[in-house]
């Protein structure tokens, strides 16, 4: 049943990502749900299976499922920050790869709800650049705009949001007795949060 539920969430998450939010959907909440359905559900299944196969008390199953889902969301939010701030020589990726391909990220979604003229202009510049790249122009046309997005407050907000999801995951571990398992799961969540440093 666990595998079937996880597969269903993965498929729904991918379908929702492909189709995109509907007119009455909040794009930010929608994006978080996609992250939870995709990466979150995979890590949640692993932590839930750990409880089941280890013979641990069933009372640990739901908190550890939630822990895994929150870790997955935090991981993807941090990926959005890393996608903008990474150095090609460190990662082998050009910064902003996702956005250049037209894939929304949390910084771009947060930028889209900003109302100050500088943010509105930057969002429009990125949207136009994505359309031009899709039409065949060189992806480097977005280099300057993505550097400004990297330095924009919305990227820091995304990092703060990721850290909040990480802390939420760690808080779910309060049901576990103190010991090596709880410590290892705490370190795992913290190590994911530290990837952005």
Spans of features found by a protein language model:
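All-alpha prenyltransferase/terpene-synthase fold signal
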Residues: 1-197
């Amino acid at each position: 049943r666990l595998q079937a539920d996880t597969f269903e969430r993965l498929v729904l998450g991918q379908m929702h990502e492909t189709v995109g939010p509907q007119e009455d959907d909040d794009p930010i909440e929608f994006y978080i749900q996609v992250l939870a359905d995709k990466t979150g559900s995979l890590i949640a299944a692993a932590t839930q299976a750990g409880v089941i196969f280890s013979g641990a008390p069933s009372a640990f199953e739901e908190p550890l499922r939630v822990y895994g889902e929150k870790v997955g969301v935090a991981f993807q939010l941090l990926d959005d920050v890393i996608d903008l701030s990474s150095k090609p020589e460190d990662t082998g990726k050009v910064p902003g790869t996702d956005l250049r391909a037209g894939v929304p990220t949390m910084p771009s979604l947060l930028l889209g709800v900003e109302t100050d003229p500088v943010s509105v202009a930057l969002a429009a510049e990125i949207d136009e650049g994505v359309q031009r790249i899709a039409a065949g122009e060189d992806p480097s046309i977005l280099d300057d705009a993505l550097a400004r997005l990297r330095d924009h407050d919305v990227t820091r907000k995304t990092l703060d949001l990721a850290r909040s999801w990480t802390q939420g995951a760690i808080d779910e571990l309060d049901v576990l007795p103190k010991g090596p398992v709880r410590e290892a799961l705490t370190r795992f969540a913290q190590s994911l949060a530290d990837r952005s440093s």
